[in-house]
Amino acid sequence: MADLFFGGPFRRILYGRPFPPDWASASATAAMDWVETPTSHVLRINVPGLGKDDVKVQVEDGNVLTVRGAAPHAAAEKEREREKDVVWHVAERGRPEFAREVALPAEVRVEQIRASVDNGVLTVVVPKEPAPARPRTRPIAVSSKL
Protein backbone atom coordinates (compact mmCIF):
# COMPACT_ATOMS: atom_id res chain seq x y z
CA MET A 1 0.00 0.00 0.00
CA ALA A 2 2.78 2.43 0.92
CA ASP A 3 4.52 1.58 -2.34
CA LEU A 4 1.41 2.57 -4.20
CA PHE A 5 1.44 6.05 -2.65
CA PHE A 6 5.20 6.67 -2.28
CA GLY A 7 6.26 5.00 -5.54
CA GLY A 8 6.14 6.30 -9.08
CA PRO A 9 5.69 10.04 -9.58
CA PHE A 10 5.24 10.77 -5.86
CA ARG A 11 8.70 9.41 -5.08
CA ARG A 12 10.29 12.16 -7.18
CA ILE A 13 8.23 14.84 -5.42
CA LEU A 14 8.97 13.58 -1.91
CA TYR A 15 12.61 12.57 -2.28
CA GLY A 16 13.85 14.61 -5.24
CA ARG A 17 15.02 18.17 -5.53
CA PRO A 18 12.48 20.76 -4.38
CA PHE A 19 12.59 22.60 -7.74
CA PRO A 20 13.74 21.67 -11.21
CA PRO A 21 17.29 22.89 -11.90
CA ASP A 22 16.00 25.59 -14.26
CA TRP A 23 14.01 27.18 -11.42
CA ALA A 24 17.06 27.49 -9.23
CA SER A 25 19.49 30.37 -9.57
CA ALA A 26 21.04 30.78 -12.99
CA SER A 27 24.50 30.07 -11.68
CA ALA A 28 25.94 28.07 -8.84
CA THR A 29 29.03 28.71 -6.78
CA ALA A 30 32.03 26.50 -7.41
CA ALA A 31 33.98 25.15 -4.43
CA MET A 32 37.22 27.07 -3.88
CA ASP A 33 40.42 26.94 -1.81
CA TRP A 34 42.47 30.13 -1.34
CA VAL A 35 45.99 29.95 0.06
CA GLU A 36 48.55 32.70 0.51
CA THR A 37 52.25 32.08 0.00
CA PRO A 38 55.05 34.58 0.61
CA THR A 39 55.00 35.57 -3.08
CA SER A 40 51.40 35.06 -4.25
CA HIS A 41 47.77 34.18 -3.60
CA VAL A 42 46.72 30.83 -5.10
CA LEU A 43 43.07 30.04 -5.76
CA ARG A 44 41.97 26.52 -6.71
CA ILE A 45 38.40 26.17 -7.98
CA ASN A 46 36.64 22.91 -8.86
CA VAL A 47 35.56 22.90 -12.51
CA PRO A 48 34.89 19.21 -13.27
CA GLY A 49 34.57 18.43 -16.95
CA LEU A 50 35.49 21.93 -18.11
CA GLY A 51 38.44 22.86 -20.31
CA LYS A 52 40.25 26.14 -20.84
CA ASP A 53 37.70 27.28 -23.44
CA ASP A 54 34.80 26.71 -21.01
CA VAL A 55 36.17 28.97 -18.24
CA LYS A 56 36.48 32.77 -18.27
CA VAL A 57 38.72 34.55 -15.74
CA GLN A 58 38.90 38.34 -15.56
CA VAL A 59 39.52 41.22 -13.17
CA GLU A 60 36.72 43.77 -12.87
CA ASP A 61 36.48 47.07 -11.02
CA GLY A 62 40.20 47.17 -10.27
CA ASN A 63 40.56 44.23 -7.91
CA VAL A 64 37.55 41.88 -8.19
CA LEU A 65 38.53 38.54 -9.71
CA THR A 66 35.57 37.01 -11.57
CA VAL A 67 35.53 33.38 -12.67
CA ARG A 68 32.70 32.06 -14.83
CA GLY A 69 32.27 28.68 -16.42
CA ALA A 70 29.77 26.67 -18.40
CA ALA A 71 29.94 23.18 -19.81
CA PRO A 72 29.53 22.93 -23.56
CA HIS A 73 26.01 21.80 -24.30
CA ALA A 74 26.40 20.81 -27.94
CA ALA A 75 27.03 17.14 -27.07
CA ALA A 76 23.98 16.96 -24.80
CA GLU A 77 21.78 18.56 -27.47
CA LYS A 78 22.98 16.07 -30.10
CA GLU A 79 22.28 13.20 -27.70
CA ARG A 80 18.71 14.43 -27.16
CA GLU A 81 18.13 14.89 -30.90
CA ARG A 82 19.22 11.30 -31.62
CA GLU A 83 16.79 9.95 -29.05
CA LYS A 84 13.55 11.42 -30.41
CA ASP A 85 11.49 8.34 -29.53
CA VAL A 86 12.55 8.10 -25.86
CA VAL A 87 10.81 9.56 -22.81
CA TRP A 88 12.97 11.61 -20.47
CA HIS A 89 12.06 11.26 -16.78
CA VAL A 90 14.90 13.31 -15.28
CA ALA A 91 17.37 15.64 -17.03
CA GLU A 92 19.68 17.08 -14.37
CA ARG A 93 22.97 16.85 -16.25
CA GLY A 94 22.17 19.80 -18.47
CA ARG A 95 24.58 22.65 -18.88
CA PRO A 96 26.05 23.35 -15.45
CA GLU A 97 27.14 26.95 -14.99
CA PHE A 98 28.92 28.67 -12.14
CA ALA A 99 30.19 32.10 -11.24
CA ARG A 100 32.53 33.18 -8.48
CA GLU A 101 33.75 36.66 -7.48
CA VAL A 102 36.67 37.28 -5.15
CA ALA A 103 37.79 40.68 -3.86
CA LEU A 104 41.57 40.65 -4.16
CA PRO A 105 43.85 42.44 -1.70
CA ALA A 106 45.23 45.81 -2.82
CA GLU A 107 48.87 44.65 -2.88
CA VAL A 108 48.70 42.34 -5.92
CA ARG A 109 50.01 42.50 -9.48
CA VAL A 110 46.79 42.30 -11.48
CA GLU A 111 48.59 42.39 -14.84
CA GLN A 112 50.56 39.22 -13.96
CA ILE A 113 47.68 36.93 -12.94
CA ARG A 114 47.93 33.43 -14.47
CA ALA A 115 45.26 30.72 -14.74
CA SER A 116 45.33 27.08 -15.84
CA VAL A 117 42.97 24.09 -15.82
CA ASP A 118 44.20 20.60 -14.97
CA ASN A 119 42.18 17.50 -13.98
CA GLY A 120 39.02 19.48 -13.23
CA VAL A 121 40.72 22.12 -11.09
CA LEU A 122 41.21 25.74 -12.16
CA THR A 123 44.33 27.22 -10.55
CA VAL A 124 44.63 31.01 -10.48
CA VAL A 125 47.95 32.47 -9.30
CA VAL A 126 47.86 36.13 -8.24
CA PRO A 127 51.39 37.47 -7.61
CA LYS A 128 51.89 39.86 -4.71
CA GLU A 129 53.54 43.24 -4.96
CA PRO A 130 56.95 43.07 -3.31
CA ALA A 131 57.03 44.70 0.08
CA PRO A 132 58.59 48.15 -0.06
CA ALA A 133 62.24 48.11 0.93
CA ARG A 134 62.70 49.19 4.50
CA PRO A 135 65.10 52.09 4.74
CA ARG A 136 68.36 51.26 6.42
CA THR A 137 69.20 53.09 9.59
CA ARG A 138 72.04 55.45 8.96
CA PRO A 139 73.59 57.94 11.30
CA ILE A 140 73.26 61.62 10.43
CA ALA A 141 76.01 63.99 11.47
CA VAL A 142 74.85 66.93 13.53
CA SER A 143 76.67 70.22 13.00
CA SER A 144 76.87 73.27 15.18
CA LYS A 145 77.66 76.96 14.46
CA LEU A 146 79.34 77.62 17.78
UniProtKB/Swiss-Prot annotation:
<protein>
    <recommendedName>
        <fullName>16.0 kDa heat shock protein, peroxisomal</fullName>
    </recommendedName>
</protein>
<keyword id="KW-0576">Peroxisome</keyword>
<comment type="subunit">
    <text>May form oligomeric structures.</text>
</comment>
<dbReference type="GO" id="GO:0005777">
    <property type="term" value="C:peroxisome"/>
</dbReference>
<dbReference type="GO" id="GO:0009651">
    <property type="term" value="P:response to salt stress"/>
</dbReference>
<dbReference type="GO" id="GO:0051259">
    <property type="term" value="P:protein complex oligomerization"/>
</dbReference>
<feature type="domain" description="sHSP">
    <location>
        <begin position="23"/>
        <end position="143"/>
    </location>
</feature>
<dbReference type="GO" id="GO:0006457">
    <property type="term" value="P:protein folding"/>
</dbReference>
<keyword id="KW-0346">Stress response</keyword>
<feature type="short sequence motif" description="Microbody targeting signal">
    <location>
        <begin position="144"/>
        <end position="146"/>
    </location>
</feature>
<dbReference type="InterPro" id="IPR008978">
    <property type="entry name" value="HSP20-like_chaperone"/>
</dbReference>
<dbReference type="InterPro" id="IPR002068">
    <property type="entry name" value="A-crystallin/Hsp20_dom"/>
</dbReference>
<dbReference type="Pfam" id="PF00011">
    <property type="entry name" value="HSP20"/>
</dbReference>
<comment type="similarity">
    <text>Belongs to the small heat shock protein (HSP20) family.</text>
</comment>
<dbReference type="GO" id="GO:0042542">
    <property type="term" value="P:response to hydrogen peroxide"/>
</dbReference>
<dbReference type="GO" id="GO:0009408">
    <property type="term" value="P:response to heat"/>
</dbReference>
<dbReference type="InterPro" id="IPR031107">
    <property type="entry name" value="Small_HSP"/>
</dbReference>
<dbReference type="GO" id="GO:0051082">
    <property type="term" value="F:unfolded protein binding"/>
</dbReference>
